[in-house]
Design a protein with these regions (language model features):
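Hydrophobic alpha-helical connector segments
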Residues: 60-63, 74-105
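Helix-turn-helix
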Residues: 14, 18-56, 60
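Short amphipathic alpha-helix in the helical subdomain of ABC transporter nucleotide-binding domains
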Residues: 8, 82, 86, 149-156
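Amphipathic alpha-helical packing segments from all-alpha helical-bundle domains
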Residues: 67-70, 75, 87, 102-105, ...
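Hydrophobic/aromatic-rich alpha-helical bundle segments in the mid-to-C-terminal region
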Residues: 119-128, 140-172
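N-terminal intrinsically disordered/low-complexity leader segments
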Residues: 1-10
Length: 172
């Protein structure tokens, strides 16, 4: 049975929401397609027609989860002192509710140890998510107009995702 474009888009969103949550709760390797489709209320065929593979689901789910986290954190407000915004973001990140809600928490922290064993597409998606998180956090740094050298230092301190994708280290 053929589904409408709107229904296919809804199915895709359901799959990604279920996968993002399950991957954060259980890890990528421990989460099966059957678990994802059951949580999404769809069939295996629905998942494979949308994505083609579990790896493609994982890559897309990482990006969706990281964007959702970024929206939750919000953007830096130039009118607000950087330290105040940074304090708010760090407080949110380190809160007990964030810590205890692993399925809704930071996809980077939840999957960081899984990523080196994942296929290239998943590692690349993780690298993009790490870079996005760094760029977002850079907006809350006390000196928003940092030099390139300072920026490199921040990347070393906070991590830059290159460990997730060994090929990325050659790009910079």
């Amino acid at each position: 049975m053929r589904v409408s474009k709107q229904k296919a888009a809804e199915n895709r969103e359901q799959i990604l929401a279920a996968a993002a949550r399950l991957f954060r709760e259980n890890g990528i390797a421990a989460t099966g397609v059957d678990m994802i489709t059951r949580r999404a209320g769809l069939t295996h065929g629905g998942l494979y027609s949308q994505f083609g593979s579990k790896d493609a689901v994982a890559a897309a789910a990482i990006l969706v989860a990281s964007r959702k986290s970024a929206r939750r954190l919000g953007r830096p407000d130039e009118r607000q002192p950087a330290e105040q915004g940074l304090r708010r973001v760090v407080g949110q990140y380190l809160s007990t509710s964030h810590r205890d809600e692993r399925g809704r928490g930071c996809v980077l922290a939840a999957l960081g140890t899984d990523i080196p064993r994942q296929p290239r597409a998943v590692r690349q998606a993780f690298t993009i998510a790490v870079e996005g998180a760094f760029d977002l956090m850079a907006g809350w740094m006390p000196d928003r107009g940092t030099s390139r050298r300072q920026e490199k230092g921040y990347r070393r301190v906070f991590g830059d995702g290159r460990g997730a994708d060994p090929g990325a280290c050659c790009k910079r």
